[in-house]
């Protein structure tokens, strides 16, 4: 049975370059809530590190997989579990997931998501007439599923897709 656990509460956000003091935040969150709205274009473009602990979900059936689901992280993200990189993602507007089963341990686990809204040559657009908000501006979930489950690895999709293939006779 699929279980979705919200991880939106209890995050610590720190800035490795020291631009701001560490703070406790609830998702969704952006560090540009104020400076991104002042109209002068000089908002903070940096890397923020979100971290929190979680307990590995127990699947009622034997086996099972655990995924972390990030609903949006602007603009580059690196997800780590217990210090090991689980996945990276470029592009701040889409859902992404990572199977973290083998990185989890019984008891407390540390989830860290490094997010950057810095100007990156590999990311389009590099500049625009809007603010490139930095942060986890949608939620983060754990998804626990049994071994037999719909695909959760395909581009953050819902796990099932139907594609009609019309034929010449209209069928």
What is each model feature region?
Residues 2-3, 23, 32, 68:
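Residue-level marker of intrinsically disordered, low-complexity segments enriched
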Residues 3-5, 12-17, 40-41, 45-159:
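Accessory beta-strand-rich segments of carbohydrate-active enzymes
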Residues 11, 18-32:
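Extracellular glycan-recognition surfaces and repeat-rich motifs
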Residues 32-40:
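N-terminal glycine-rich cofactor-binding segment
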Residues 164-171:
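Contiguous beta-strand segments within globular domains
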């Amino acid at each position: 049975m699929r279980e979705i656990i919200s991880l939106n509460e209890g995050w610590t956000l720190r800035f490795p370059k020291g631009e701001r003091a560490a703070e406790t935040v609830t998702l969704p969150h952006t560090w540009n809530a104020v400076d991104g709205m002042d109209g002068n274009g000089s908002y903070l473009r940096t890397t923020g590190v979100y971290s929190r602990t979680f307990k590995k979900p127990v699947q009622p059936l034997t086996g099972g997989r655990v995924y972390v689901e990030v609903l949006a992280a602007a603009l580059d993200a690196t997800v780590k579990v217990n210090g090991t990189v689980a996945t990276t993602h470029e592009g701040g507007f889409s859902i992404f997931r990572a199977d973290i089963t083998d990185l989890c341990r019984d008891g407390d686990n540390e989830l860290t998501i490094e997010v950057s809204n810095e100007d990156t040559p590999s990311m389009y657009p590099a500049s625009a007439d809007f603010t490139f908000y930095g942060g986890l501006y949608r939620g983060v979930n754990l998804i626990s599923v049994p071994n037999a489950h719909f695909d959760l690895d395909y581009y953050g999709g819902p796990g099932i897709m139907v594609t009609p293939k019309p034929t010449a006779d209209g069928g």
